[in-house]
Amino acid sequence: MAVLKPVRLGVNVDHVATVRNARGGALPDPVRAAALAKAAGAHGITAHLREDRRHIRDADMERLKAEIDLPLNFEMAATDEMVAIACRVRPNACCLVPERREERTTEGGLDAAGQRAELAPRIARLKAAGIRVSLFIAADPAQIAAAAELGADIVELHTGAWCDAVTEGRHVEAEAEFVRLKAGARQAAGLGLEVHAGHGLDYATAERIAAFPQIVELNIGHFLIGEAIFVGLDQAIARMRAAIAAGRAAVGDGAAA
């Protein structure tokens, strides 16, 4: 078996901005959090500029690109406004996600199969600007196939349903979701897509999914920012990196077969 590269950790700083915006003003600064994440060994920074600007602001995205020497993953809705902003900021990648104003967080995956007409020109415009395109989707065969057909470079598999089932002790459902994720990772890699995963991951679930040999990157935010309240961001990231490394090491032990 070929030696696998370590799984990259992308740190999402959205919820530093959530705390800032709860009171207004400039603090805590999500760009400072991104700098601390880099110092702690993060491989990339993720931030979601929502249409309602509930946490990350336009200026945050511009500063993250200008001040943080790490790949920037710009999460956004597939709208003309967001595509124009992304083409100006020029992040390393854009991850297209579904958005509903009434949701507290991104609740489901993008319907790539059902929104081809809307997605295709926006994906093409981002790629023409030299931006890699990722689609945040469920581990569903039709969605993964659509992502490849649309010309996406990456799929980020939505791990939220699995993580919720694990946390709530719904063991049968958790195992079924895990099997779906494993099959989805295999399908996506087989179609030439780079495979990422994220949403709801903690130390234990990140370790387990890092054992999928197809996984290249995990994007984690809310859990790490919550842990940082108690142990500091550097320690939270260090422990997460160790968990991910342990999961990747399990590939050689046959745990991901």
From Swiss-Prot:
Organism of derivation: Xanthobacter autotrophicus (strain ATCC BAA-1158 / Py2)
Stated role: Catalyzes the complicated ring closure reaction between the two acyclic compounds 1-deoxy-D-xylulose-5-phosphate (DXP) and 3-amino-2-oxopropyl phosphate (1-amino-acetone-3-phosphate or AAP) to form pyridoxine 5'-phosphate (PNP) and inorganic phosphate.
Keyword Transferase applies: yes
Keywords carried by this UniProt record: Cytoplasm, Pyridoxine biosynthesis, Transferase
Predominant subcellular localization, coarse grouping: cytoplasm
Site description Transition state stabilizer, residues in chain: 156
This protein's name: Pyridoxine 5'-phosphate synthase
CDD domains, sorted: PNPsynthase (cd00003)
Known EC number: 2.6.99.2
Binding-site positions, 1-deoxy-D-xylulose 5-phosphate: 14-15, 50, 55, 105
Top-rank taxon: Bacteria
Pfam families: PdxJ
Subunit and partners: Homooctamer; tetramer of dimers.
Any one Gene Ontology molecular-function term assigned to this protein's record: pyridoxine 5'-phosphate synthase activity
Binding, 3-amino-2-oxopropyl phosphate: 12, 23, 200, 221-222
Enzyme type, top EC level: transferase
Active site: 48, 75, 199
Catalytic activity annotation: 3-amino-2-oxopropyl phosphate + 1-deoxy-D-xylulose 5-phosphate = pyridoxine 5'-phosphate + phosphate + 2 H2O + H(+)
